[in-house]
Amino acid sequence: MEAVERNNMAQEKAIVNNKIREAVLETVCGITSRLPENAAYEVAFAGKSNVGKSSLINTLLMRKSLARTSSQPGKTQTINYYRINKDETRDGFAPDCYLVDLPGYGFATASVEVKEKWGRMIERYLRTSKALKRVFLLVDIRHAPSANDRMMYEWIVQSGMESVVIATKKDKLKPSQIDKSLKQIRTGLNLGADTRIIPFSSETREGRDAVWDLIREASGSSDSSDMKGH
């Protein structure tokens, strides 16, 4: 009972600390679309199909279905830009920024042509977005990272971005399994000691506050165009 009460208190604190006044899907880009040149900074979320990106974004934004979720892998086939708290500067509110949902990769039944298009779309975004400040790589905490996860992590590093790994679906594991699973992710991605892994659950909202802290922290990082050599 005490654990439940502590969890409820943590959820209430996260909501108080990172209130959402406004959240809208502002831009949707396909493979041939021109990427927007946003003034507000961007943080991106990458991960394989069905890893829980849409659920995570909805949890961050305290919305049930702004980011469309589906049990069918490969649902997100575009780059989706969510504008958060436009011109908001008050304490206690989430910062004015964009959350960028990248297409899920590794969808087994997608054609080779479709997979290549998604790959080019993601790579182009990572390489060219001047507003991008941080990339969150989502990995299912229940499974070892896949070859696609490793390739995605390498893309992020090569683009000059700092990566943070989010271990999704933490509520699906027993507490005794958590440490072993996190070590499996760190080893599987060959992460350095400084690379952060955030356990996250869309069911309990655990990790919401930690992710928002890192999103806010990203606003003060070095200009992404300098990091990428532009």
Give, region by region, the residue ranges found by the protein language model.
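Conserved protein kinase catalytic core
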Residues: S33, S65, F107-A110, S146, ...
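Canonical P-loop GTPase G-domain recognition
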Residues: I20-S33, K172-H230
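Switch II of P-loop NTPase G domains
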Residues: L35-E37, T76-Y81, G92-C97, P103-K133, ...
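Short, glycine/charged-enriched secondary-structure capping and boundary segments
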Residues: A39-A40, L60, V112-K115, R150-E154, ...
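Conserved G1/Walker A P-loop phosphate-binding module
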Residues: E2-F107, G220, S225-G229
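Conserved C-terminal guanine-recognition region of P-loop GTPase G domains, centered on the G4
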Residues: G119-T195
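Conserved nucleotide-binding/hydrolysis micro-motifs of P-loop NTPases
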Residues: K75, D87, C97, G104-G106, ...
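Hydrophobic aliphatic residues
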Residues: L60-K64, L126, L189, I215
